């Protein structure tokens, strides 16, 4: 986490319309103070960029000594692995490998056993992508349940990056699918507010990017929980969509589609190009599914090929406008075929049989707790003849050789195993 003050008062409007107020610093540091702010490293850097664009001489965010702020006797107790002096380490070394990861114990971190009710603040998101956040929900739920074994009531709030986060509304919606989360708020948090909590967890450093283990296990380790002692059967995510406000017409579109047959979502593209199904092959797979699966209605939320028209094919790309729309669509499916995308993680939360076409070697570790997923691995057999560090597609050979071996019959056969 980063502790800082601002040189002049300023208001910032974030993407959902919320106004964040930053007031000019007033001493002292060691007491509850509405002008001392705490946020994640990434959010702090975004804030610095905003200040620089407004007036780089008038508006500055200046680092404070975190130990001085934490001397306040009312400052909450930290749970889990600590990353002190994060700003200094990242500015000097530019790499997370220089952090000293010291194992922590959740039980030994606690000190308010006499209280029936405790408040916990999580500072920062559990990852930045939809896939990371939804996967990590399993660890967050287990963390909450472990606390509930000790306290009669646990109020869990999460504060997420907001200063220049175009996905703030999306990220907030994802966390609001968790019934055990009390509230989702934008960063930064001031020291007066954080002192109302009993405990805090510093998620500014993404622990899952530092440990070569499954993302659920990584976050359990971060929370001070021995992931090896948690049964695999408990490492699942849940998504509550009862409160969703869907785009107009989407619900009826799904109802009408279900009357025509079983629904199969085909979702070939990831935000990471190397995890996506190449476009030409995605189009051919889509055509094959439409042609060979008469008892299914094929659904997409991506405009794969506007020229494809069929009675058993529905393109919902104009209806899938928000993360809530997309989660609802995925939750309505009977089966799913996808690349390694957020659809995979959402589907497992709803126990929907899913075929993942994976393109990276460590997919087994990533999917080890997904009981409703089958996988076809497409190996990257490409070779780059360029002698330079940068990639040159014109000098890459065999790039699609393994994709050419992937047959629609093999995809359908694997799908029918469920």
Report each predicted region and the residues it spans.
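Catalytic machinery of carbohydrate-active enzymes
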Residues: 2-418
């Amino acid at each position: 986490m980063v502790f800082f003050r601002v040189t002049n008062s300023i208001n910032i409007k974030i993407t959902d319309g919320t106004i964040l107020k930053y007031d000019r610093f007033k001493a002292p540091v060691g007491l509850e103070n509405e002008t001392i702010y705490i946020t994640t490293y990434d959010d702090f850097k975004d804030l610095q960029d905003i200040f620089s664009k407004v007036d780089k001489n008038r508006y500055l965010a200046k680092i404070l000594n975190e130990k001085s702020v934490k001397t306040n006797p009312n400052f909450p107790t930290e749970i889990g692995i600590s990353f002190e002096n994060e700003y200094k380490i990242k500015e000097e070394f530019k790499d997370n490998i220089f952090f000293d990861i010291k194992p922590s114990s959740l039980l030994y971190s606690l000190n308010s056993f006499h209280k029936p009710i405790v408040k916990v603040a999580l500072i920062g998101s559990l990852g930045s992508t939809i896939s990371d956040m939804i996967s990590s929900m399993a660890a967050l739920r287990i963390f909450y349940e472990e606390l509930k074994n000790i306290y009669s009531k646990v109020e869990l709030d999460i504060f997420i990056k907001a200063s220049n986060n175009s996905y703030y509304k999306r990220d907030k919606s994802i966390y609001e699918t968790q019934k055990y989360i009390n509230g989702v708020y934008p960063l930064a948090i001031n020291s007066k507010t954080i002192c109302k909590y009993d405990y805090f967890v510093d998620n500014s450093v993404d622990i899952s990017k530092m440990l070569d283990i499954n993302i659920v296990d990584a976050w359990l380790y971060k929370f001070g929980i021995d992931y090896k002692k948690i049964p695999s059967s408990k490492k699942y995510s849940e998504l509550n969509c009862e409160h969703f406000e869907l785009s107009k017409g989407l619900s009826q579109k799904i109802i009408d589609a279900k009357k025509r047959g079983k629904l199969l979502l085909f979702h070939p593209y990831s935000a990471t190009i190397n995890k996506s199904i190449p476009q030409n092959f995605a189009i051919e797979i889509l055509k094959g599914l439409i042609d060979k699966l008469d008892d299914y209605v094929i659904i997409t939320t991506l405009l794969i090929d506007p020229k494809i028209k069929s009675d058993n094919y529905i393109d919902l790309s104009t209806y899938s406008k928000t993360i809530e729309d997309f989660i609802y669509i995925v939750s309505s499916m009977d089966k799913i075929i996808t690349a390694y995308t957020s659809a995979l993680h959402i589907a497992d939360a709803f126990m929907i049989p899913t075929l993942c076409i994976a393109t990276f070697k460590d997919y087994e570790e990533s999917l080890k707790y997904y009981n409703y997923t089958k996988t076809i691995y497409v190996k990257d057999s490409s070779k780059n003849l360029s002698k330079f560090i940068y990639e040159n597609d014109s000098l890459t050979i065999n790039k699609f050789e393994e994709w050419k071996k992937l047959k629609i019959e093999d995809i359908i056969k694997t799908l029918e195993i469920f």
